[in-house]
Regions:
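Disulfide-stabilized extracellular recognition modules
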Residues: 90, 94, 98-153
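Short, polar/charged, Gly/Pro-enriched helix-capping and turn/loop motifs at alpha-helix termini
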Residues: 35-36, 70, 118
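Positively charged n-region of N-terminal signal peptides that target proteins for export
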Residues: 1-3
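A short alpha-helix/helix-coil micro-patch that ends at or immediately precedes a cysteine
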Residues: 15-65
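Short, surface-exposed glycine/acidic/tryptophan-bearing loops
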Residues: 49-103, 121
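Hydrophobic h-region of N-terminal signal peptides that target proteins for export
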Residues: 6-15
């Protein structure tokens, strides 16, 4: 049996400040950034969404349990199907996945340095996000990350 630990990075209680991951991402978005030779201007801050968190959590758990990295789940689900399963209605949707970094800030830095992931981070077309990670100590990949982006209709 694989050891599977799951932790979604949930925002702090209302009124006590935003989640550090959300704050870090919004700091990245507040400044213009070049992603793979393409300049992206500063983008508005994102808000945390619990339904996106649930979808991200489910996908990290699936990847960690089955030792893979990808945008399609073992059940054949796509990001669209996973967020809709959680009741999230959307007009724009995106997903970043990663493995390896033990800390959320390191995962954000890695995404910011990858052109496609960076474009998601900087997209002004998204208004909400969530990040979750799962750990499988017996997998070569170790820590799995999913970041969901969305904009309601």
């Amino acid at each position: 049996m694989r050891l599977l630990l799951l932790l979604a990075l949930l925002p702090a209680c209302a009124g006590q400040g935003a989640d550090p991951v959300l704050e870090a991402l919004n700091r990245i978005r507040a400044e213009g950034r070049t992603c793979g030779g393409v300049y992206h201007p500063a983008a508005p801050p994102l808000a945390w969404d619990a339904r996106l968190t649930a979808a991200a959590r489910a996908h990290t758990e699936d990847m960690a349990a089955h030792g893979f990295l990808g945008h399609v789940g073992t059940d054949g689900s796509t990001v669209r199907e996973r967020v809709e399963r959680e009741g999230y209605l959307w007009s724009a949707l995106g997903e970043n996945v990663a493995y390896g970094p033990a800390q959320a800030e390191a995962a954000l830095r890695a995404w910011a340095e990858s052109p496609g992931h960076c474009a998601n981070l900087m997209s002004g077309g998204y208004s909400e996000m969530a990040v979750a990670h799962a750990v499988n100590a017996r997998s070569d990949m170790g820590v799995y990350w999913v970041q969901q982006f969305g904009t309601p209709p």
